[in-house]
Amino acid sequence: MGKINAENTSKHVTFSKNAFIPVCNWCRNVCGYCTFRNENFKLLKMDEMKEILTKADTFGCREALFTFGENVDENEKVKEELKKMGYSGILEYLYEISAWCLENTNLIPHTNCGILSYDELKYLREVNASMGLMLENSSARLCGTIAHEKSPGKDPKLRIEMIENAGKLKIPFTTGILIGIGETFEERVNSIFEIKRIHEKYGHIQEVIVQNFRSKPQIPMENYKEPSPVEMFKMIILSKLILEDISIQVPPNLNRETGQLFLMAGIDDWGGVSPLTKDFVNPEAPWPDIEELNIFSKELGFTLKERLPVYEKYITEEWVDKKILEKIKK
């Protein structure tokens, strides 16, 4: 244990003060553990997003987390709504609000919207300092389980391809694994090694999230057992040992009772925390106050340190679009 804690010689634990913008909550995937997707979808209007971003700026937020379901353009109703507003698709819509965000607020965009092609990633790189996609698990076996049997976008080959494409494009990237969706211990470890393999090739993975499944009412996996703190503890230690210099994050709103335990295990980031918006993926789990996180961290001798959505070592011309870099350096 001493060795794990010694790795974080700075004794800092970071977080990003963000605003969560759920651009659209329809998705082509129907995952067994998800409550974000809704057939009666809501597509946020441009003015609604601008209002949230403007307010977030007054709260001192520095990350704009743009999220929507995968391939929302497959939904004809979404497509029609976008067309009426003058947009060819969701990515053009996202690009415009991201560009507006950069020009009119102090927030920096970070997008997580499911599978994107190489060209789509390249397009969005112009207005995003970093991007993300959870690997969840590298095992194709899970595609035939209740977790992913109705989710074509959860094919690990597709997700690995996108993470690699982000590396080719030098996009600072956040990924992670999901614990407790029917995977074996070996599959968890293999997933971490797959992330390591990709990072060793491209060097772009800035953080890895070790996220625990949480049961929710009225989901197919409602009665599935949640992973124990011991299971999470093991995976955090292993992830830290395997991934070495990559930051390890555990969402604090999903782990209020065990967060300090996981800090001792080796995490060095609390992820995005918003003083304004809720976690729309886990709406039942409110964010802790930043002061609460500060106390959490201080009690174990760690200093809470705010960061941007892009990690400091990636804030260079090699990794960030010139316009965004100029904004960050101001």
From Swiss-Prot:
Pfam families: Radical_SAM. Binds 1 [4Fe-4S] cluster. The cluster is coordinated with 3 cysteines and an exchangeable S-adenosyl-L-methionine. It comes from Methanococcus maripaludis (strain DSM 14266 / JCM 13030 / NBRC 101832 / S2 / LL). InterPro entries: Aldolase_TIM, CofG_family, Elp3/MiaA/NifB-like_rSAM, F420, rSAM. This is 7,8-didemethyl-8-hydroxy-5-deazariboflavin synthase. [4Fe-4S] cluster binds at C27, C31, C34. Keywords: 4Fe-4S, Iron, Iron-sulfur, Lyase, Metal-binding, S-adenosyl-L-methionine. The keyword rRNA-binding does not apply. Consists of two subunits, CofG and CofH. Residues 13-253 form the Radical SAM core domain. The keyword Iron-sulfur applies. GO terms for molecular function: 4 iron, 4 sulfur cluster binding; 7,8-didemethyl-8-hydroxy-5-deazariboflavin synthase activity; iron ion binding; transferase activity, transferring alkyl or aryl (other than methyl) groups.
